[in-house]
Amino acid sequence: MQERHTEQDYRALLIADTPIIDVRAPIEFEQGAMPAAINLPLMNNDERAAVGICYKQQGSDAALALGHKLVAGEIRQQRMDAWRAACLQNPHGILCCARGGQRSHIVQRWLHDAGIDYPLVEGGYKALRQTAIQATIELSQKPIVLIGGCTGCGKTLLVQQQPNGVDLEGLARHRGSAFGRTLQPQLSQASFENLLAAEMLKTDARQNLRLWVLEDESRMIGSNHLPECLRERMTQATIAVVEDPFEIRLERLNEEYFLRMHHDFTHAYGDEQGWQEYCEYLHHGLSAIKRRLGLQRYNELAARLDAALTTQLTTGSTDGHLAWLVPLLEEYYDPMYRYQLEKKAEKVVFRGEWAEVAEWVKAQ
């Protein structure tokens, strides 16, 4: 059974999105996993904890014996069935545990006894994690062009359309503002970093690129933060600023935050609960910046939001949202972004409307 254990092998796994059958306990998987991994644990959280205590108190032989006792009979058969099905569904996949130790070797041996030869990651998740960290450090050294602009300028779409673009907000499952959450929960920090590394590796392998095109992000995107190596390089990067007309920005924001989010919530939860979730999402976003708006202004905008939601519910029209969105942009988001941009004005190398910036970026 051929094992993979070189740095290039690990990178190749990430670039190819090789399916990984991760046999660590769910708690370990939730703390950090590779993008193409599925969690089919040898031991659940309680079993792993019991074996860990036994190991500390009685040593490795006793812990191993306890593990075999806990994962036996019907439990073992159920897990074998799941591993067998996953192997057949992913014939070019690979097994992985924490460090390429006993857990992945035990599962590999059991599968072999059942007639399935399946490789494993020699260094386990730890080796893949170190590969992801190192790849991000190395690839971050390439030049970066940042796409800046006020809310609603279509920065994310512009980045997505570049062959050398990496959509940081898409990877983080958050659009980076008080209203930025999506219906997908954010990943753990380690899983986000692993996903980012894999995306950078794949993009670089496709393009052999000279520079990255990224959105001008702050350090935090929701609950995830950018790796320090990348964030440091972004602070040194040149910036192209999208300056679209206010009306165009409003159209984009209406589509993204009202029409699309309402559709997504109702698609996920059904009409009634979806509407409630959508309303709560908008109110939560406004509430998140209550302190910065001031109580009086917040109450005024919240009342306008309620009125807009009533209109949307009864007529289907989202036009009423302009009554609170326009002042929110004019009084809060636009001044905040312009202030931030002023502090790095010397890094701005191009300004223009969306199509002009897109054309300029392609020429770089």
From Swiss-Prot:
The keyword Transferase applies. It is an enzyme of class 2 (transferase). InterPro entries: Rhodanese-like_dom, Rhodanese-like_dom_sf, SelU. GO terms for biological process: tRNA wobble uridine modification. Transmembrane segments: none annotated. Its EC number is 2.9.1.3. The active site is at 97 (s-selanylcysteine intermediate). It comes from the Bacteria. The keyword Ribonucleoprotein does not apply. One of its GO terms (molecular function) is tRNA 2-selenouridine synthase activity. Residues 14-137 form the Rhodanese domain. Keywords: Selenium, Transferase. It catalyses: 5-methylaminomethyl-2-thiouridine(34) in tRNA + selenophosphate + (2E)-geranyl diphosphate + H2O + H(+) = 5-methylaminomethyl-2-selenouridine(34) in tRNA + (2E)-thiogeraniol + phosphate + diphosphate; 5-methylaminomethyl-2-thiouridine(34) in tRNA + (2E)-geranyl diphosphate = 5-methylaminomethyl-S-(2E)-geranyl-thiouridine(34) in tRNA + diphosphate; 5-methylaminomethyl-S-(2E)-geranyl-thiouridine(34) in tRNA + selenophosphate + H(+) = 5-methylaminomethyl-2-(Se-phospho)selenouridine(34) in tRNA + (2E)-thiogeraniol; 5-methylaminomethyl-2-(Se-phospho)selenouridine(34) in tRNA + H2O = 5-methylaminomethyl-2-selenouridine(34) in tRNA + phosphate. Disulfide bonds: none annotated. PANTHER family: TRNA 2-SELENOURIDINE SYNTHASE (PTHR30401:SF0). Involved in the post-transcriptional modification of the uridine at the wobble position (U34) of tRNA(Lys), tRNA(Glu) and tRNA(Gln). Catalyzes the conversion of 2-thiouridine (S2U-RNA) to 2-selenouridine (Se2U-RNA). Acts in a two-step process involving geranylation of 2-thiouridine (S2U) to S-geranyl-2-thiouridine (geS2U) and subsequent selenation of the latter derivative to 2-selenouridine (Se2U) in the tRNA chain. Belongs to the SelU family. Monomer. This is tRNA 2-selenouridine synthase. It comes from Escherichia coli O1:K1 / APEC. The gene is selU.
